[in-house]
UniProtKB/Swiss-Prot annotation:
PANTHER family: 40S RIBOSOMAL PROTEIN S11 FAMILY MEMBER (PTHR10744), SMALL RIBOSOMAL SUBUNIT PROTEIN US17 (PTHR10744:SF52). A lipid is attached at C60 (S-palmitoyl cysteine). This is Small ribosomal subunit protein uS17. The modification N-acetylalanine is found at A2. It comes from Canis lupus familiaris. The modification Phosphoserine is found at S67, S110. Its main location: cytoplasm. Keywords: Acetylation, Citrullination, Cytoplasm, Lipoprotein, Methylation, Nucleus, Palmitate, Phosphoprotein, Ribonucleoprotein, Ribosomal protein, RNA-binding, rRNA-binding. One of its GO terms (biological process) is translation. Coiled coil: none annotated. The lineage of its organism: Eukaryota, Metazoa, Chordata, Craniata, Vertebrata.
Amino acid sequence: MADIQTERAYQKQPTIFQNKKRVLLGETGKEKLPRYYKNIGLGFKTPKEAIEGTYIDKKCPFTGNVSIRGRILSGVVTKMKMQRTIVIRRDYLHYIRKYNRFEKRHKNMSVHLSPCFRDVHIGDIVTVGECRPLSKTVRFNVLKVTKAAGTKKQFQKF
């Protein structure tokens, strides 16, 4: 528990009461605090790290105060330079009526990445769900990570 206290404010889950009276029971070593987590539904499993981990993230869909509603999208991870936020790229085709053909287009999205997803790298495919606005540019949360299969450069349509 001491390793997560790196911020100036005390890090704790707001739904867990930590000040249980231990005078009558006697101090029996360091007990592990209970952890709040939830099943977000929609067929997504709660990661093992969210249940057993010690991180505190109020914007996590599994352990925080964020509900997933609205759109479910997928994209490819392109940048990981922010703290707990990644940039994903969504490719799509746009029809040009004059030439009766399609052109490639893409959009970049900033997405909140919970600490329960540890092994995420550039090129992985992530499934994201819409939530309330978490910051100026972040409106989606990572729900599932799929490892990149091959290193073949190609246009991927989601």
